[in-house]
Amino acid sequence: MAIRKYKPTTPGRRGSSVSDFAEITRSTPEKSLLRPLTKSGGRNAHGRITTRHRGGGHKRAYRVIDFRRLDKDGIPAKVAHIEYDPNRTANIALLHYVDGEKRYILAPKGVTQGTPIESGPTADIKPGNNLPLRNIPTGTTIHNVELRPGGGAKLARAAGMSIQLLGKEGPYATLRMPSGEIRRVDVRCRATVGEVGNAEQSNINWGKAGRMRWKGRRPTVRGVVMNPVDHPHGGGEGKTSGGRHPVSPWGQPEGRTRKPNRPSDKLIVRRRKTGKKR
């Protein structure tokens, strides 16, 4: 993937860029793997906003991605197409299995049209192949990693993400996460070899607010320009600074967004590095 920069022909084009989609081989998705996707606008089942700054955007269809690949052990497949997916930053690869079934997976870096793909404990250590952690050599770069055996991949699924397998001891494998956190995961969990493709996606300059609205992203308003009824930093005469340490609209101090005392915390060997010492 390469980034194409626009010339400043209009204010919205100035500084903006777009992917050249050179890796994409087909523009229409596989119909049998599409599902309807209803927009929530950031609301839950009670109609209350649970995620701010969401709403609008272009209509999308959900592409069903195979995050398990457990039932395809020993069945060879070949990459038929690399496609764009509007629901994620990574591209997706359409696999044609020899038994006739078609499935989508996240497109790893280096996997192109015609690349053979396989799953299972005896699969080769090549990008796109899916194996249990116990069968992957130490030091290998992996992505699409499960947290629980058979639970489906949860870690390193965004464009350009990868995890390094540091070692294996007893029933656990030690992984270095993209954030720098080091944690242990059951060796029966499965992972895909290689890193997620489309890494240049993070270098795209969106250029104007309208392109973010197409993606369903609404404006993020600063608390200091709100009224006191809307935010703890609101109000004041003129451009005031807020007069207190940064907080959320509900008064919670900024940072520390991780939920404390999660059951899986006992498997964390070393925490990620944060910007501030607390």
From Swiss-Prot:
Self-association and partners: Part of the 50S ribosomal subunit. Forms a bridge to the 30S subunit in the 70S ribosome.
GO cellular component, one term: large ribosomal subunit
Pfam families assigned: Ribosomal_L2, Ribosomal_L2_C
Keywords, in A-Z order: Ribonucleoprotein, Ribosomal protein, RNA-binding, rRNA-binding
Family matches, as SMART domains: Ribosomal_L2, Ribosomal_L2_C
Stored NCBIfam families: rplB_bact
Organism, as annotated: Nocardia farcinica (strain IFM 10152)
Annotated protein name in UniProt: Large ribosomal subunit protein uL2
Feature: compositional bias, Basic residues: 45-57, 269-278
Family, per entry: Belongs to the universal ribosomal protein uL2 family.
GO annotation, biological process: cytoplasmic translation
Any one Gene Ontology molecular-function term assigned to this protein's record: structural constituent of ribosome
Ranges where the record places region Disordered: 1-20, 25-57, 224-278
Function statement: One of the primary rRNA binding proteins. Required for association of the 30S and 50S subunits to form the 70S ribosome, for tRNA binding and peptide bond formation. It has been suggested to have peptidyltransferase activity; this is somewhat controversial. Makes several contacts with the 16S rRNA in the 70S ribosome.
SUPFAM superfamilies cross-referenced by the UniProt entry: Nucleic acid-binding proteins, Translation proteins SH3-like domain
